[in-house]
Amino acid sequence: MKEKAAETMEIPEGIPKDLEPKHPTLWRIIYYSFGVVLLATITAAYVAEFQVLKHEAILFSLGLYGLAMLLHLMMQSLFAFLEIRRVNKSELPCSFKKTVALTIAGYQENPEYLIKCLESCKYVKYPKDKLKIILVIDGNTEDDAYMMEMFKDVFHGEDVGTYVWKGNYHTVKKPEETNKGSCPEVSKPLNEDEGINMVEELVRNKRCVCIMQQWGGKREVMYTAFQAIGTSVDYVQVCDSDTKLDELATVEMVKVLESNDMYGAVGGDVRILNPYDSFISFMSSLRYWMAFNVERACQSYFDCVSCISGPLGMYRNNILQVFLEAWYRQKFLGTYCTLGDDRHLTNRVLSMGYRTKYTHKSRAFSETPSLYLRWLNQQTRWTKSYFREWLYNAQWWHKHHIWMTYESVVSFIFPFFITATVIRLIYAGTIWNVVWLLLCIQIMSLFKSIYACWLRGNFIMLLMSLYSMLYMTGLLPSKYFALLTLNKTGWGTSGRKKIVGNYMPILPLSIWAAVLCGGVGYSIYMDCQNDWSTPEKQKEMYHLLYGCVGYVMYWVIMAVMYWVWVKRCCRKRSQTVTLVHDIPDMCV
């Protein structure tokens, strides 16, 4: 099906086109029908509770839905492996003729992370005459000035240009500032503003540029960089101010875009810069590896990566300029969107029919929250953008491989079925169901972690199985909170210099904890009413004993591994790391 659709599309020449397959309505019907049938089949398998495997002696059973999820994980892992192997075998050339603008979005960044970011950008291995470096700071007050000073220090001796802009591209003039008889419009770019002319002149004539502008959010900052660049470069690279680039990060992404004119964007492998700050940051480092090298690698096999990550991504500039205004003015339920900037950029590329890729050869290291509350706020924000962008992405399924439709449906319904399964088991009235649920969660996580160990060649990935508890107790309820507050754009992130004070995401966790505790209490109470002297209950008691011992032993072993392997050995080793390419893949 992918090949048929591809045959109907033309390779872009000059101005990029919106690549529609022939008979788009027919393809839409086919893809949407497939999605509906897939959803109905999975739902029917879940509701029917058909048992594929059942063993009364050990109280074990595997339903059709569980088997389907196992097959999904196996397929995803297989395609990820094939993609990584393909990339490893390929030796793509680089012409070093394409011009690149490396754009950095910054907002009250931790000076320690910012200096690492700027220095890594300075030493990126790409011809200086082909590379621009642009830092746009979201804020123009005295509290933001330190970022510009650091930029000047790092790029001292280079072709540097700086400008403190009192406004931004969408500053609204006050009535007294407007000429008599004119009518100011809300959020209308001030094309005649001298600040705009100054910014664009600096960006197009200087190699290293730093702009401080009126606060407007990350999307406003990114818009300034993209708009000021105009058509002066071939590719635009995005980067966050807390990200440290590998020396080859830029050139490896350029290679991918040069290899095929149908590739509209490419993302790289984002690792964690501060994995040993806390348990949260360490688990995030393992989760990031899985997200990029399994999930996005699988999507890249089918040329449909769903999100080019903000810390490390690259876009064809001629495509980006086509949808720049539409991207900036995105609305959802009548409200301007301030979250999900990177995911919507990716979706805009996909909406035009261009392919999106991932390469693990391009690498960067980004800061992640080390405190639980800040991490939870981050995950809630990402989940909001996921649900919103899912609706947008569904409009363009017919332009890409059918895998995109399949994965979109499966990933969307997964948390709802997991929630239903948990509630159904803990309120079944038997303690064994609760223990079996806990065992199943960790067994499945352990199998996935073992595969990751093999794929990465590092036993540290065994600890990835611990992430399942973070998901079940934190991420799962936060998904419902994100869904219910989808149109609330004010609850976002803050600069690294500030402490997150948004405690709202704790509310769904409290409700979820009450539901779980209520279910466990109900099952214990109901089981205590039964006669445990019967042969069936005696056998169940043995299973309960073995299950509980096994579960406790698992956590003891994992806790010891984490404490000895990570907290002591790896942290000491990480303190000797000074250069980005010296940062170990993970301590062994």
UniProtKB/Swiss-Prot annotation:
Tissue occurrence: Expression moves as a gradient through the embryo. The mRNA is first expressed in the animal region of the blastula, and by early gastrula is found everywhere except in the outer layer of the dorsal blastopore lip. By mid-gastrula, protein is present in the inner ectodermal layer and the endoderm, then disappears from dorsal ectoderm as the neural plate is induced and later decays in a dorsoventral direction. Last expressed in ventral regions of the gut at the tailbud stage (at protein level).
- Cofactor or coenzyme needed: Mg(2+)
Pathway where this protein functions:
Glycan biosynthesis; hyaluronan biosynthesis
Please indicate if the UniProt record lists Transmembrane helix as a keyword: yes
The organism's lineage is: Eukaryota, Metazoa, Chordata, Craniata, Vertebrata
Is Transferase there in the keyword field? Answer: yes
Q: Which organism is it from?
A: Xenopus laevis
- What are the GO MF terms of this UniProt record? hyaluronan synthase activity
Topology in the membrane? Multi-pass membrane protein
Under InterPro entries, the record lists:
Nucleotide-diphossugar_trans
Q: What's the protein here called?
A: Hyaluronan synthase 1
By sequence similarity, the record places it as follows: Belongs to the NodC/HAS family.
Taken from the record's topology, the Cytoplasmic segments are 1-28, 83-411, 455-456, 527-543
Report the gene name.
has1
**Predominant location:** membrane
Catalytic activity entry: [hyaluronan](n) + UDP-N-acetyl-alpha-D-glucosamine = N-acetyl-beta-D-glucosaminyl-(1->4)-[hyaluronan](n) + UDP + H(+); N-acetyl-beta-D-glucosaminyl-(1->4)-[hyaluronan](n) + UDP-alpha-D-glucuronate = [hyaluronan](n+1) + UDP + H(+)
Query: What UniProt keywords apply to this chain's record, in alphabetical order?
Result: Glycosyltransferase, Membrane, Transferase, Transmembrane, Transmembrane helix
User: What cellular component GO annotations does this protein have?
Assistant: plasma membrane
Q: Report the EC number(s), separated by commas if there are several.
A: 2.4.1.212
The protein's job, in short, is: Catalyzes the addition of GlcNAc or GlcUA monosaccharides to the nascent hyaluronan polymer. Therefore, it is essential to hyaluronan synthesis a major component of most extracellular matrices that has a structural role in tissues architectures and regulates cell adhesion, migration and differentiation. Also able to catalyze the synthesis of chito-oligosaccharide depending on the substrate.
Subcellular compartments? Membrane
Give TM segment ranges: 29-49, 62-82, 412-432, 434-454, 457-477, 506-526, 544-564
**Sequence ranges on the Extracellular membrane side:** 50-61, 433, 478-505, 565-588
Superkingdom of this protein's organism: Eukaryota
